[in-house]
Amino acid sequence: MGLPWYRVHTVVLNDPGRLLSVHIMHTALVSGWAGSMVLYELAVFDPSDPVLDPMWRQGMFVIPFMTRLGITNSWGGWSITGGTITNPGIWSYEGVAGAHIMLSGLCFLAAIWHWVYWDLEIFRDERTGKPSLDLPKIFGIHLFLAGVACFGFGAFHVTGLYGPGIWVSDPYGLTGKVQPVNPSWGAEGFDPFVPGGIASHHIAAGTLGILAGLFHLSVRPPQRLYKGLRMGNIETVLSSSIAAVFFAAFVVAGTMWYGSATTPIELFGPTRYQWDQGYFQQEIYRRVSAGLAENLSLSEAWSKIPEKLAFYDYIGNNPAKGGLFRAGSMDNGDGIAVGWLGHPVFRDKEGHELFVRRMPTFFETFPVVLVDGDGIVRADVPFRRAESKYSVEQVGVTVEFYGGELNGVSYSDPATVKKYARRAQLGEIFELDRATLKSDGVFRSSPRGWFTFGHASFALLFFFGHIWHGARTLFRDVFAGIDPDLDSQVEFGTFQKIGDPTTRRQAV
């Protein structure tokens, strides 16, 4: 009998062996995809410039996740932090990819074995001889094992006790590296930007999981609770598992989009809120002010600004600037960054220092307006020149660069001044190579944006899946049309699985 697409999974109902088989095959597919994706990304990744062409500018998706867990070296002889290495060891990017592909192959074979040998004694109830699973016991086993893995990750991998630690950086994404992390047991452990919270929460959650697993292995559920929550029905497991997954997906969508210690900006790119709040701009100005206080010249103060910090303060690195349906990496949009031209300082003929008003995140075009230190508009690039009062030509605006490639260069030509004023709307000014990748000049999102969009979308979908399967399992008797006032014995689950010879049939 042909099944409609939305009912095909009924073939593994009441068939524990093959239910296990298809889940092992799913693990094989996921692991195989992960390993293959790493190899693909390594084939197209250019590690030569970690400052101006980092992984997130190149659209890498799995490499950042490996890196935050402590993988930094390649068998190709390069390190993610720049420079060359001679002994990357087995746990390089390629080594991890190979391990996933080998796991995929083993899971593939295990899935075939369990599909062929589906009728195992372990899946049969000793009393009735029918296929059945002790779901509360299985829940306890899985909870215990997940707790052990969670505790082990927090206590050994993250702390560096037996493992590399995790990626840790400063608030401005400049000094990131893999290092051991001590657990934070105080209130600071609840700050999402404190790496120590990752260790302490995994240790605490793992301990709780181990204790809860042992509880569920040693204590049977009360009969009324067992029946009320339909603990004997495999669809209850499906429903609650979907709930766990969609909840996790919503959480990680939030930690990715808003930023946290688990999503360092060096690996995933800055967040849109850092542009909205002028986060990097404030730090740059603070450093310049500190330099001036040390009697440095303006040129020297700006020259001390790290190119990496200046690059974060550029709207093209804002993940909200790329459309959801613009495929490709950031480099395919505005191009590959080649160098920082320097910080432009605009002045009018009266000597006022002018600041270009920056483009807000969700604008594609924005008027060029220059204001003084008090916020008073002093110059602009007018839409209608006939009525202009503040045009660059009328006000006599000049621009001088400090730091970067154009350090000390000044322009008074109005066309050139307007060109740099337009570019200053977008933050710090960079030379971008659009020829190499045939970049089209239209901004793209970073992996931070793609991850958030994907996980938020699937979380919503899985939320409805949880409601659907939860309702099906809780109200199965209602949906099956069994009269609750029926006195006669009814075989529960009649016609639940099409083609099952054990299902009672009524002769027509």
Curated annotation (Swiss-Prot):
A GO term for molecular function: electron transporter, transferring electrons within the cyclic electron transport pathway of photosynthesis activity
Localization per record: Plastid, Chloroplast thylakoid membrane
Membrane topology note: Multi-pass membrane protein
Cofactor binding: number and manner: Binds multiple chlorophylls. PSII binds additional chlorophylls, carotenoids and specific lipids.
GO biological process: photosynthetic electron transport in photosystem II
Keyword Thylakoid set for record: yes
Gene3D superfamilies cross-referenced by the UniProt entry: Photosystem II CP47 reaction center protein (3.10.680.10)
Sorted UniProt keywords: Chlorophyll, Chloroplast, Chromophore, Membrane, Photosynthesis, Photosystem II, Plastid, Thylakoid, Transmembrane, Transmembrane helix
Superkingdom per UniProt: Eukaryota
Major localisation: plastid
InterPro entries reported for this sequence: PS_antenna-like, PS_II_antenna-like_sf, PSII_PsbB
GO-annotated cellular components: chloroplast thylakoid membrane; photosystem II
Transcription regulation among keywords: no
Transmembrane annotation, as ranges: 21-36, 101-115, 140-156, 203-218, 237-252, 457-472
Protein family according to the UniProt entry: Belongs to the PsbB/PsbC family. PsbB subfamily.
HAMAP family linked to this entry: PSII_PsbB_CP47
Subunit structure: PSII is composed of 1 copy each of membrane proteins PsbA, PsbB, PsbC, PsbD, PsbE, PsbF, PsbH, PsbI, PsbJ, PsbK, PsbL, PsbM, PsbT, PsbX, PsbY, PsbZ, Psb30/Ycf12, at least 3 peripheral proteins of the oxygen-evolving complex and a large number of cofactors. It forms dimeric complexes.
PANTHER family the record matches: PHOTOSYSTEM II CP43 REACTION CENTER PROTEIN
Function text: One of the components of the core complex of photosystem II (PSII). It binds chlorophyll and helps catalyze the primary light-induced photochemical processes of PSII. PSII is a light-driven water:plastoquinone oxidoreductase, using light energy to abstract electrons from H(2)O, generating O(2) and a proton gradient subsequently used for ATP formation.
UniProt name for this protein: Photosystem II CP47 reaction center protein
Species lineage: Eukaryota, Viridiplantae, Streptophyta, Embryophyta, Tracheophyta
